[in-house]
Amino acid sequence: MNIQALLSDKVSQALIAAGAPADCEAQVRQSAKAQFGDYQANGVMAVAKKLGMQPRQLAERVVELLDLTGIASKIEIAGPGFINIFLDRQWVAEKVEYALTAPKLGVTPVEPQTIVVDYSAPNVAKQMHVGHLRSTIIGDAAVRTLAFLGHNVIRANHVGDWGTQFGMLIAYLEKMQNENASDMGLSDLELFYQQAKKTYDEDEEFALRARAYVVKLQSGDEYCRQMWRKLVDITMAQNQVAYDRLNVTLTKDDVMGESLYNAMLPEIVADLKAKGLAVESEGATVVYLDEYKNKDGEPMGVIIQKKDGGYLYTTTDIACAKYRYETLGADRILYYIDSRQHQHLMQAWTIVRKAGYVPESVPLEHHMFGMMLGKDGKPFKTRSGGTVKLSDLLDEAVERAGKLIAEKNPDMPADELKQVINAVGIGAVKYADLSKSRTTDYIFDWDNMLALDGNTAPYMQYAYTRVVSVFRRAGVDESSLTLPLVITEDREAALATRLLQFEEIITTVAREGTPHVMCSYLYDLAGLFSSFYEHCQILNAESEEIRQSRLKLAMLTAKTLKQGLDTLGIQTVERM
């Protein structure tokens, strides 16, 4: 049930009937304050200006023509021409009843699209670090949200599994196997990479072999391909441990590494030349883009093939977009990559559009994000200035959550305690990130993220347990709530209306890729439930009808909190 869309449609019809053009916008918004109703239509001012009318006069005409019978109990004009809409409580009660029993909380089924989501993208033979966290969890929240709405979502883990460094890595893996050291299983990928680099820099014979292996690997040599595959498999097995701990939906089946596009690169360069988009320049192949100028005001050159024949990231990204449209059948392609890559992506996509590889009807969207900073406002590092490994960060999160939870639950069974600690620790790290606007940098702060009050995972998880505890205490389930829902109190109405806005919120999150909007909604919902719980007797209500009505509101609150948190990849617990 999308109330905003319903009201927008009704107000637009009234505006058109009042003489507005067919493309006019009703500008219906959720009201910020209860005194202005539940929704506000703000489109009258812009339309009145076009029609040369007084806004108030047009607003009066629109209200006369606006048919909200059975939906609104009152419509008011405020100020110069704002239209305030107060929803009818009987109508709200009926919609809550529907949401309670309907699939997906009554969210309207969408016309399914095939949507490719590019996220996470770790590198082979390197451990995942905190720099991979934002792409991984924000991207996964998008995947979960789009899948919930009914879209066919293709997860694309654009793993860095190709490049000149693989000659060095294959040579070093071979050296270890010859020394019977392969049982280390690359347990410390970071150390493996560092030692390979050190050997490459210090041993000329090793470096020659490494360079030869690059050529062999790129020409399809079977031995080199086997060694390369082993490196990829070991890395992704370790990354899977991180994904599972993070409650992220990525698996090995979602890996679409850079190597996937290798065979396409020569064809793309040849095609861009044939189309007159790419030219030779000092031995390299370059596409000059009028849309981007260098410091001298000349079209910027984007190299797609170096003079030694090697390809660049841009070439791979062009191939990647082409593949996602032509082979995967994408209707929409989302990239969760940090903001520093924006110009690079825009240049690649400009070439993609000019070449006709992806039509304009298929959006290419860079859902960029800022950096994760320490309390000092600088990039988040270890005390010694090194990169923080993701596994170390998650270990610390669980350890800190353990102290917090064990202290408050000395009698909880060990298995349940472990599960709660894990859900709270991992949830705290994820929610702290997801609750901030992704476009900004954010400060990583343990104390804030593990706080039991404020917009944090522990608070939200506790809010959920508080709601479900009502049903434990009452000993009732949904099937026993047979009386019709009635709304008699303002706090009931406020909670019920907010519950019905779930579809508006999840639709916005799916469109914009903004999980912080869902976090804000859930936090607001938890606050409204808290106020309702404190001021409206539930189990000891004055009548059985009111008792059941309030239990139904509590039930839909629990379902909405759980579903909303699930779209963020945050686990709920029954007790805390």
UniProtKB/Swiss-Prot annotation:
<dbReference type="GO" id="GO:0006420">
    <property type="term" value="P:arginyl-tRNA aminoacylation"/>
</dbReference>
<dbReference type="InterPro" id="IPR008909">
    <property type="entry name" value="DALR_anticod-bd"/>
</dbReference>
<dbReference type="GO" id="GO:0005737">
    <property type="term" value="C:cytoplasm"/>
</dbReference>
<keyword id="KW-0436">Ligase</keyword>
<dbReference type="Pfam" id="PF03485">
    <property type="entry name" value="Arg_tRNA_synt_N"/>
</dbReference>
<dbReference type="GO" id="GO:0005524">
    <property type="term" value="F:ATP binding"/>
</dbReference>
<dbReference type="InterPro" id="IPR035684">
    <property type="entry name" value="ArgRS_core"/>
</dbReference>
<dbReference type="InterPro" id="IPR036695">
    <property type="entry name" value="Arg-tRNA-synth_N_sf"/>
</dbReference>
<keyword id="KW-0030">Aminoacyl-tRNA synthetase</keyword>
<dbReference type="InterPro" id="IPR001278">
    <property type="entry name" value="Arg-tRNA-ligase"/>
</dbReference>
<dbReference type="InterPro" id="IPR005148">
    <property type="entry name" value="Arg-tRNA-synth_N"/>
</dbReference>
<dbReference type="Pfam" id="PF05746">
    <property type="entry name" value="DALR_1"/>
</dbReference>
<keyword id="KW-0648">Protein biosynthesis</keyword>
<dbReference type="InterPro" id="IPR009080">
    <property type="entry name" value="tRNAsynth_Ia_anticodon-bd"/>
</dbReference>
<dbReference type="InterPro" id="IPR001412">
    <property type="entry name" value="aa-tRNA-synth_I_CS"/>
</dbReference>
<dbReference type="Pfam" id="PF00750">
    <property type="entry name" value="tRNA-synt_1d"/>
</dbReference>
<keyword id="KW-0963">Cytoplasm</keyword>
<keyword id="KW-0547">Nucleotide-binding</keyword>
<keyword id="KW-0067">ATP-binding</keyword>
<dbReference type="InterPro" id="IPR014729">
    <property type="entry name" value="Rossmann-like_a/b/a_fold"/>
</dbReference>
<feature type="short sequence motif" description="'HIGH' region">
    <location>
        <begin position="122"/>
        <end position="132"/>
    </location>
</feature>
<dbReference type="GO" id="GO:0004814">
    <property type="term" value="F:arginine-tRNA ligase activity"/>
</dbReference>
<comment type="similarity">
    <text>Belongs to the class-I aminoacyl-tRNA synthetase family.</text>
</comment>
<protein>
    <recommendedName>
        <fullName>Arginine--tRNA ligase</fullName>
        <ecNumber>6.1.1.19</ecNumber>
    </recommendedName>
</protein>
<comment type="subunit">
    <text>Monomer.</text>
</comment>
